[in-house]
Amino acid sequence: MAKRDYYEVLGVSKTASDDEIKKAYRKLAMKYHPDRNPDNAEAEEKFKEASEAYEILSDSEKRSMYDRMGHNAFEGGFGGAGGGFGGFSAEDIFSQFGDIFGGAFGGGGRQQRQRRGSDLRYVMELTLEEAVKGVKKTITFTAPAPCDVCDGKGSKNPKDVETCKTCHGSGQVRMQQGFFSVQQTCGTCRGQGKIIKNPCHACHGSGVADRQQTLEVTIPAGVDNGDRVRLSGKGEAIRDGQAGDLYVEVVVREHEIFQRDGADLYMDVPVSIADAALGKEIEIPTLEGRVSLKIPEGTQTGKLFRLRGKGVRPVRSSMVGDLLCRIVVETPVNLTSRQRELLKELQASFDGEDSASSPKKKSFFDRLFD
């Protein structure tokens, strides 16, 4: 009987992520595990089929080979790879020689790697002030954690946990591929080396259960959009393995006044026509409080003033950026009768003489009509 497509076996698409593949396999394994289906040959066959599919699709190199050549990649030795070792790294090749020749090539004595849970991601939204100055925040999220009932063991009674008879507790089995002996994860115990005879009723033997968790997170001063804070061991928990990490990713809300570019801050400073023309000392806000800014006589829209050291000190940097103030000269609106009169008088005074009061305007028209 022809083998079914591995993606079809797990019920996932060919573009499925590693997490999606893991979740699909876990669901099938719990459903068809021999311990939960004694004397059920069909369930045992489905369990083996799912384990075989997961063994290939959970390994990036094997998955790549399978995507290119299908089941032929793992049948009849290394057929389909042009007679060589297509798709296998040098480490894989020498590890297989080591299996045969007693570790002469450094691969025979490798020990099983400790299983590890998946890393998790939490998006935290901050104000600009919080990102620049640092903050402590409490977060709440739901993630797999050690089961409270069985203390993460998968069974309340330690006597109900036995050494796997297929792999004898190693979590690995040897598969013959032509001339070579290849070590693979044991499909019976899923690489754990143990079989649970009487699974915990709360977690069904997995040793973990989804639980709401609350953590206090310290965000360092100077973080920016996309920066991540790593909380070691706070990710997905798994039975008989190491928990993954939790990554808190920073998203900074848009500020009504300041825009950030690396270590520097930018802001628009509105100035009246009179203040821009005559000059004035004004007060402007910064993240540290209000400071004075001197507007020289004749300041134009777009003029930048730099206030050194009023920006941001990025994470892992000893340098503080600057605050750059862009002047925006505002045209007055909703004029009173008196203001309109005065502006008309001013307008007439400008139009009535060849004044140097508008040098850019004069230069523009000179070029236009030359």
UniProtKB/Swiss-Prot annotation:
Residues 5-70 form the J domain. Binds 2 Zn(2+) ions per monomer. Zn(2+) 2 binds at C164, C167, C186, C189. A zinc finger (CR-type) spans 134-212. One of its GO terms (cellular component) is cytoplasm. Keywords: Chaperone, Cytoplasm, DNA replication, Metal-binding, Repeat, Stress response, Zinc, Zinc-finger. Its main location: cytoplasm. Its cofactor is Zn(2+). Gene3D superfamilies: DnaJ domain, Heat shock protein DnaJ, cysteine-rich domain, Urease metallochaperone UreE, N-terminal domain. Residues 351-370 are annotated as: Disordered. GO terms for molecular function: ATP binding; heat shock protein binding; unfolded protein binding; zinc ion binding. It is found in: Cytoplasm. Pfam families: DnaJ, DnaJ_C, DnaJ_CXXCXGXG. Homodimer. Participates actively in the response to hyperosmotic and heat shock by preventing the aggregation of stress-denatured proteins and by disaggregating proteins, also in an autonomous, DnaK-independent fashion. Unfolded proteins bind initially to DnaJ; upon interaction with the DnaJ-bound protein, DnaK hydrolyzes its bound ATP, resulting in the formation of a stable complex. GrpE releases ADP from DnaK; ATP binding to DnaK triggers the release of the substrate protein, thus completing the reaction cycle. The J domain is necessary and sufficient to stimulate DnaK ATPase activity. Zinc center 1 plays an important role in the autonomous, DnaK-independent chaperone activity of DnaJ. Zinc center 2 is essential for interaction with DnaK and for DnaJ activity. This is Chaperone protein DnaJ. It comes from Acinetobacter baumannii (strain ATCC 17978 / DSM 105126 / CIP 53.77 / LMG 1025 / NCDC KC755 / 5377). The gene is dnaJ.
